[in-house]
Amino acid sequence: MAADLIVGIQWGDEGKGKIVDLLAQEYNVVCRYQGGHNAGHTIVVDGKTIALHLIPSGILNPKAVNIIGNGVVVSPAALLKEMEQFDNLDGRLLISDKAHLIFKYHEEIDRAKERLRGKNAIGTTGRGIGPAYSDKVSRQGHRIGELKDIDTLHKKILDYFETNKIYFEALGISFPSENELRMELQRYQEVLMPYVVDTTNYLWDLLELGEAKILLEGAQGTMLDIDHGTYPYVTSSNTIAAGACTGLGLAPKDIGKVIGIAKAYCTRVGNGPFPTEDNGEDGERLRKQGHEFGTTTGRPRRCGWFDAVAAKYASRINGCDEMALMKLDVLDGFEKIKVASKYLYEGEEIDYMVSDLENVEPIYLEFEGWDRVEGIRSWKDLPLNAKRYIEAIEELIETKISLISTSPDRADTIKR
């Protein structure tokens, strides 16, 4: 039995957490395969809001095993804080021994480099994600499995400090004392090591037996992918569906159905091109009605209309079999609603993605709005204009929309 996959097809914050939480009731294994605690999922169940950054959204299913894969960069401090929200995680949380660690100095490097970039800042969350991935690629990172031998890991980190001493001093970053570092590592070892296993072999065994239903959960979104996003204004990992293979140790044939997640409009956090951004009254209204502030940083998100060109590109690169359209209710009350169906690029109309997205202008289709869809749970009860809007998006992105969210609550979801 293959593993199904959920992936964001915009700039992140699409509402993946709600869909994973909804579908996780049907799966007994949920896996996270990339990113770090820069990502944030907000889930509302029975009126209670839960924010997750590292632990997969399946944690709310008491029968599900949740896996943090090798492609994730893990801040032990952030993970420990997140774990405190739950009473008992024994047997419900597994962490890959190959996942790389984020330490405080990674966060300090991140923030220092952003300051140095000035007006050219990328707009990172300052959580140390990029520096941790940079250490991983340059073969000087530290993996969570190394916590089993504190003496060796302690020495390796001190050697790392010595090797990078000039760099750290140039950035104004101080080192922790040897004793502070050792105490920190001992705490992480004590709490986290009981959850650390070879998750790749664990998943292989499950797939071979064919009895488990496995769901793979991406973080951020396609347009933030390190290779296929709006570089350099991207995250430091492969956010697309293919990242699940390297981020969990799976083969392409192990991937089953791919479900893309998109908002009924677009948002972006941080800097970088955003063709459909609306800096006027409509954009501000989207932000207010959608409560568009980052789960991780609290920063106001940039808001704009649905970009069908970007969504079609993302659907194709991820191989989406179907799509979930989130936060349709945020568009309630708009007299007119826009969708970018094409771009104007170098004097020509195009319907495909380009690498220099900052040089395109959106060409819009305009739709009549509707009064209210909030809380609607069946297709037949949707206003006609809302149905027309959804069907137009389906046609433009060439992907079926099978799920429609009409409020943050898990139950307010239309299945087609």
Swiss-Prot record:
It comes from the Bacteria. It is found in: Cytoplasm. PROSITE patterns: ADENYLOSUCCIN_SYN_1, ADENYLOSUCCIN_SYN_2. Keywords: Cytoplasm, GTP-binding, Ligase, Magnesium, Metal-binding, Nucleotide-binding, Purine biosynthesis. Its cofactor is Mg(2+). Its EC number is 6.3.4.4. GO terms for cellular component: cytoplasm. Pathway: Purine metabolism; AMP biosynthesis via de novo pathway; AMP from IMP: step 1/2. The active site is at D13, H41. One of its GO terms (molecular function) is magnesium ion binding. IMP binds at D13, E14, G15, K16, N38, A39, G40, H41, T125, R139, Q220, T235, R299. It is an enzyme of class 6 (ligase). GTP binds at residues 12-18, 40-42, 301, 327-329, 405-407. Mg(2+) binds at D13, G40. Homodimer. Belongs to the adenylosuccinate synthetase family. Plays an important role in the de novo pathway of purine nucleotide biosynthesis. Catalyzes the first committed step in the biosynthesis of AMP from IMP. HAMAP family: Adenylosucc_synth (MF_00011). This is Adenylosuccinate synthetase. It comes from Nitratiruptor sp. (strain SB155-2). The gene is purA.
